[in-house]
Amino acid sequence: MKCLNDGELKNMQKKYDWLLFDADETLFDYPSHIGLARLAARYGIAWTDEDYARFQAVNQPLWRAYQEGRIDIGQLEAQRFADLTARTGQPAPQLNRELQLEMAQLCNLLPGARELLVAAHGAGIRIGIITNGFAVQQEPRLRASDVSQYVDLLVVSELEGFPKPDRRLFEAALRKMKQPAPQRVLMIGDNPDTDIAGGARAGMDTAWYNPKGRACPEHVAPTYHIRHLQQLHAVVLPPR
């Protein structure tokens, strides 16, 4: 599926009451290698590229298992920090909390994110975030990025009990929005399997943010396919 150009997007312009964003790698970057190195340094560990590779070899399959409902968030937390727990003597929940608060200060808005949030807010469109990330990080990160004033709703899978792409998490978001028609909500995310498939299951229009130009899985059909967040201005903002 090709990315749409600005002219094609403008021809697809539609009025949305809500924009619902994924957080990591959609609104924010996520430099986990830096956060983990800082966490390890607190305990006198010189964190190497090999340490990071070993961590991700465990961490990434655990996130897939969580998204597929095969493990819960507590199991994910405990298993991904098993090595650091052994090396530091600190329990996994403590290590995870420290990492999340570190990441809240490290994450930066991606190009075009602030401008889109400001413009949508100014046009009277309400803004939500729906994330599989850990709850402790979310509000501090919004404050650190100075965008909390634009966000009307924060939905965190850890608190709701269902991870994306579970339809129930998106339905929980709709309830918190006071039940708008799903087609008046645009779900925007970088992960076709969680953000786009999950939003579509709930009846929402979807925008796949694909800055690296990856191939779209055959089972996923986003409403819009974009390379840059600023392309959404043509879709969601009223013409001047």
Protein language model features and the residues they cover:
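Asp-based, Mg2+/Mn2+-dependent phosphohydrolase catalytic module
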Residues: 2-19, 46, 50, 118-121, ...
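Hydrophobic residues in well-ordered beta-strands that form the structural core
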Residues: 29, 129-131, 208
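Short, surface-exposed acidic
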Residues: 44-54, 85-98, 150, 181-182
